[in-house]
């Protein structure tokens, strides 16, 4: 039955990523992939928040649906990689490096902040 929880969370995460990335892309013009950056950073925060919840705070199936399902489908390593490689291919190595470092370091920072937020809330 766990597969059903992961699948439902995954559907919701995929749709959230698609809609949010498209919405941001239509409002913020430029060459920086802000949609992917935003979903990956906010996903890192959500995962940090979820991981810091006290054991048993949420039912195991809900944690599975939210963590593996929703956040796993919401964030996108493949799009991040594609955008980075495309920047490098376009001769924009410095921009690719800044995007990569911002994504990775920002993700770690936001996961930690999510962890801290959960600790102060619960």
Curated annotation (Swiss-Prot):
Main subcellular location: membrane
Subcellular location: Cell membrane
Membrane topology (UniProt): Multi-pass membrane protein
Activity modulation: Na(+) is not transported, but it plays an essential structural role and its presence is essential for fluoride channel function.
Binding sites annotated in the UniProt record for Na(+): 72, 75
Any Pfam family matching the protein: CRCB
NCBIfam families to which the protein is assigned, alphabetical: crcB (TIGR00494)
Entry's family note: Belongs to the fluoride channel Fluc/FEX (TC 1.A.43) family.
UniProt xrefs under HAMAP family: FluC (MF_00454)
Identification of the protein by name: Fluoride-specific ion channel FluC 2
Originating organism: Moorella thermoacetica (strain ATCC 39073 / JCM 9320)
Recorded name of the encoding gene: fluC2
């Amino acid at each position: 039955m766990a597969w059903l929880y992961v699948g439902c969370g995954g559907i919701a995460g995929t749709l959230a990523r698609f809609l949010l990335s498209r919405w941001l892309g239509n409002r913020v013009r430029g060459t920086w992939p802000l949609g992917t950056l935003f979903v990956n950073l906010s996903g890192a925060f959500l995962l940090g928040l979820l991981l810091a919840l006290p054991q048993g705070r949420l039912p195991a199936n809900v944690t599975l649906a939210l963590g593996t399902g929703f956040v796993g489908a919401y964030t996108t390593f493949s799009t991040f990689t594609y955008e980075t490689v495309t920047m490098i291919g376009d001769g924009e190595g410095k921009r690719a490096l800044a995007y990569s470092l911002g994504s990775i370091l920002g993700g770690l920072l936001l996961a930690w902040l999510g962890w801290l937020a959960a600790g102060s809330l619960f």
